[in-house]
Amino acid sequence: MIFDTKAAKFTLKNVFFLSLLIAAGAILIFSLVPGDCWFGSKTDWYSQHVTIADYMRKNFYATGQLFPDFTGLGGGTDFYSLSYYGFMRPDVLLSYCFPNLPVAFFIQGYAIFEILFGGGLLYYWLHKKGFSDFTSFVCGFFYLTANCFFQAHRQIIFVNYLPFLILAFLCLDKILNPEKASLYSIRPHIGLIFSLFFCILHSFYFFPSCFVACILYICHLLPQFKNGMVKSCQAGKIWW
């Protein structure tokens, strides 16, 4: 059964399915990584993402600057020409606090965390949308095993924004639900801003597509809630 007619409450049963989904994804990832190896390729992942992040960390220790104007990489270049790599991400900034640990440790761990986090978010979102536990679980598993996630250990900027796009969809569901407008007057808006900001922070090249996806999702939701919004809310209250 694809849809469930029951109220979409998150119960202990759902916690079990969510835990099972994340555990299955973690087992698949760690079983595919050879022993004594990083979850990353020697080409794009190590030569670009790890090397540049490590240089930035060393430069920060030497100068105290988070945004250097100039880097010595590639014979010397403007730092902002490398900004599309998303080096203000939480994993890179967190590595600054642990100088004795390799940068690769943080980038690898964060990439794995984001894959599992995205799969869990998709399960939760579909469950809240009224899909059955089976459908939500299967879709979450398909997400975890999607072919595009080979980029998680290569060009990570191609996929590391996806969990925050799903989080943006979750926030839009709450914003455009007039029945919960009184309960969620500000929080979903903050969540949407947070989600889109992190999409930019991780991969601003892909933010335009994320923004278009959110606009299309809003267009999908508006007819569904049009009657309720007219009766229950003023037009301005949808947003503020």
Where are these regions (language model features)?
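Membrane-interface coil-to-helix junctions
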Residues: 24-119, 143-163
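Membrane-embedded helix bundles of polyisoprenyl
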Residues: 21, 115-125, 129, 133-224, ...
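Membrane-interfacial, low-structure loops and terminal tails that flank and connect transmembrane helices
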Residues: 1-9, 181-185, 225-238
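Start-transfer (signal-anchor) and selected internal transmembrane alpha helices
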Residues: 1-33, 237-239
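Transmembrane helix-loop junctions in multipass membrane proteins, especially transporters and channels
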Residues: 38-39, 100, 178-179, 222-230
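Transmembrane catalytic cores of multi-pass membrane glycosyltransferases
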Residues: 45, 52-63, 205-214, 218-219, ...
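Juxtamembrane/interface motifs at transmembrane-helix termini
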Residues: 88, 172-173, 228-230
